[in-house]
Amino acid sequence: MKANRLATALASLLLCSAPAFAATPPSSSASASSASTGSDSAPTESLTERLMKPLSSVTTGTVTVEGKAISYKAVAGTLVIDGTGAKESTPEVAMSYFAYFKQGVDPSKRPITFIYNGGPGSSTVWLHMGAWGPKRVVTNDDTHTPAAPYQLVNNDYSLLDASDVVFIDMPGTGFGRLLPQGKDDAARAADRKELIKKIWGVDGDAHAFSRFITQFLSKYNRWNSPKYLFGESYGTTRSAVLAGILEEQDNIDLNGVILLSQILNFGTSIDGPQGDPGNDLPYVLALPTYSATAWYHHKLPKYDGEKLGQLLKDSVEFA
């Protein structure tokens, strides 16, 4: 059912390994329709000069989800994010995105979900090409994916039947760039250092995302759409900060926030607890999840059948 797509899709998350994206994949069934830069660009313009204008390329395609074909418009582009205060009219960063819009529906009633990976320092290629986009990279299982060639296939688990999706790359990743200003190389290098200090931090990162989202909503006239955030790993930390900024400073009431592989407290992460000797919380908190995983794979005969609830209770008490 469409109402359950965001929730049920979580259980079907496809795991992808980094080498799967090391080479250029084969072309998909999407067909190019137009490309624009926001204004004519002279051939002599530098990359930085071009990125100071919003860029976009539009294609169309079809994805099949749960047996139903969904026609969509895809936009690959950048938005230019200006500074604040005295620099509110000065470009600071170009953030890249890939947006997919279902065609033939009223966009004002259509949910829109802003999706991003974490790192911090990662683009959103993983959730885009491995989980929720209309196409996905084929992986045989959840182990290391062999070398090229790789194949793109229809993604049966795409969220496009339930929501339009926008995959956002954090500043400095994907096709985005920091945009240092200055009359010469030394001035630009100094400004770049200031931008790094400002943007590559918890608050600066979240503020950049908030300005991206508000600009995106205006550009595509989606202010009346139900709005969701979907963050993975460090992206869940970003969501916690970003949701507050959107509500308190931008007057945007979100309809929901989805946290995947949450890392709101790094002190309780089971990924590398040996780096914090004496802190046993990661082991204590992970035991119920490990127990449930073992139960799913039928490794605990005592709890086979409908005994998951009892297993979790016993795991919590033991932990």
Positions of PLM-derived features:
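Gram-negative bacterial Sec-dependent N-terminal signal peptides
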Residues: 3-21
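N-terminal cap/lid subdomain of alpha/beta-hydrolase-fold enzymes
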Residues: 33-45, 86-194
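A catalytic-pocket lid/entrance helix-loop region that shapes and gates access to the active site
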Residues: 134-138, 243, 247-319
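Glycine-rich nucleophile elbow surrounding the catalytic serine of serine-hydrolase chemistry
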Residues: 175, 231-244
